[in-house]
């Protein structure tokens, strides 16, 4: 009931997704093929509607009346549905699907930060994110136990009494547990952002072990390997391998995640972590230059591709994150995550997205080759 009262649009979207999946599971293939249930964009719209509506409601929970807030959520879902309907992208292909996946990832991530767009809300943001993660894991655990228990009960009835249930019954159980029970549980237990403590919430010992004794040593190991490689290529005076970009990216993203996980210890001025957060950004800069050189080498050797444009954008984000960490001493954790998601979104949708830039560049190169080698006449490609 709390889910319906607080997030009516998101709850309605959950019910719609559940009903659609039940129809997909139970209808004959001949009926499904050729129907709207066979369209990938239809499913992208349903999956994105839930987090979008919930994020809008969280963003305006303390700013607008419930009626206006829910109306804005409904309008956002309708616009998202219109985007799915009029989009020219082909979801069957990876980069076409990315035009839908990027917004959906943004919608889901905004559940964590939509209510904390104001300045100096990093502590409340961390508390809210921590509590939300606990609710997500708890909800998934409950849904899994419920699905397993009901499936076992169905199997036992089938075995003992020879009822011969159809295999679709097991699928129906999982659909109901994971697309109805779990979302309703989560919507009903999302923390209220306005009452999130301004002091850091105490966190589980497991998080401290993960961040301080597992992730941090791994980051030191990666950093040592990369600095040894940097010294090697300087001595040998050779260009870096393009694969070094992956390791530097992992180091940057891993360091950012570690700072997020250990945020309470950052506030408490934990000595090992204090050294890490003060020097992390500074030590990253030489490695990021190494990454940039590797990217430039790839562009020179193989030209522009969509993947390389994403790597270049990631390199830009790594620079900004390193500089931001230096200037804030690693005590601000919100901006790096929001900027990462928004850059991914902007570069994946619209006519300016990287896949379109790559397609345009390749067409221009092919046209230039045809004209320079006189391979075509009247816009037609000809061969001797």
Regions found by a protein language model. Give the residues of each.
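N-terminal signal-anchor module of multipass membrane proteins
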Residues: 1-64
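Alpha-helical transmembrane segments
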Residues: 6-27, 49-50, 69-81, 103, ...
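Alpha-helical transmembrane segments of multi-pass integral membrane proteins
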Residues: 17, 107-114, 136-155, 174-188, ...
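Membrane-helix interface and helix-disruption motif detector
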Residues: 26-45, 62-67, 86-101, 159-173, ...
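Membrane-interface helix-loop-helix junctions at boundaries between adjacent transmembrane segments
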Residues: 61-72, 83-211
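Membrane-embedded alpha-helical segments of integral membrane proteins
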Residues: 149, 251-257, 275-328
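Internal/C-terminal transmembrane anchor helices
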Residues: 331-354
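Membrane-interface segments at or immediately adjacent to transmembrane helices
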Residues: 350-384
């Amino acid at each position: 009931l709390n889910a319906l009262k607080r997030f009516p649009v998101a709850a309605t979207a959950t019910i719609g997704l559940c009903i659609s999946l039940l129809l997909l599971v139970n209808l004959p293939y001949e009926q499904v093929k050729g129907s709207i249930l066979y369209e990938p964009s239809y499913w992208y719209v349903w999956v994105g509607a839930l987090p979008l509506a919930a994020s809008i409601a969280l963003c305006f929970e303390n700013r607008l009346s419930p009626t206006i807030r829910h109306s804005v959520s409904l309008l956002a879902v309708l616009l998202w549905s219109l985007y799915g309907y009029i989009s020219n992208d082909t979801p069957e292909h990876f980069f076409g699907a990315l035009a839908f996946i990027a917004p959906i990832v943004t919608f889901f991530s905004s559940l964590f930060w939509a209510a904390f767009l104001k300045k100096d809300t990093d502590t409340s943001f961390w508390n809210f994110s921590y509590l939300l993660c606990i609710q997500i894991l708890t909800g998934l655990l409950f849904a899994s136990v419920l699905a397993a228990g009901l499936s076992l009960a169905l199997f036992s009835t089938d075995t003992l009494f020879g009822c011969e249930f159809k295999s679709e019954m097991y699928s129906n159980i999982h659909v109901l547990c994971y697309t109805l029970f779990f979302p309703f549980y989560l919507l009903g237990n999302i923390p209220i952002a306005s009452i999130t403590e301004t002091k850091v919430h105490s966190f589980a010992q497991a998080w401290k072990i993960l961040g301080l004794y597992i992730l941090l040593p791994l980051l030191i190991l990666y950093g040592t390997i990369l600095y040894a490689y940097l010294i090697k290529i300087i001595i040998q005076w050779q260009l870096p391998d393009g694969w070094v970009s992956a390791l530097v990216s992992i180091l940057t993203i891993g360091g950012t995640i570690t700072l997020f996980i250990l945020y309470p210890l950052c506030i408490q001025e934990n000595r090992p972590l204090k050294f890490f957060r003060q020097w992390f950004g500074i030590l990253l800069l030489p490695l990021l230059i190494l990454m940039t050189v590797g990217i430039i080498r790839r562009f020179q050797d193989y030209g522009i591709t969509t993947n390389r444009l994403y790597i270049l954008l990631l390199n830009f984000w790594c620079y900004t994150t390193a500089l931001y960490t230096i200037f804030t001493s690693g005590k601000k954790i919100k901006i790096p995550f929001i900027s990462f998601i928004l850059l991914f979104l902007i570069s994946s949708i619209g006519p300016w997205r990287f896949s379109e830039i790559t397609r345009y560049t390749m067409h221009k190169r092919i046209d230039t080759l045809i004209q320079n080698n006189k391979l075509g006449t009247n816009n037609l490609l000809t061969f001797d």
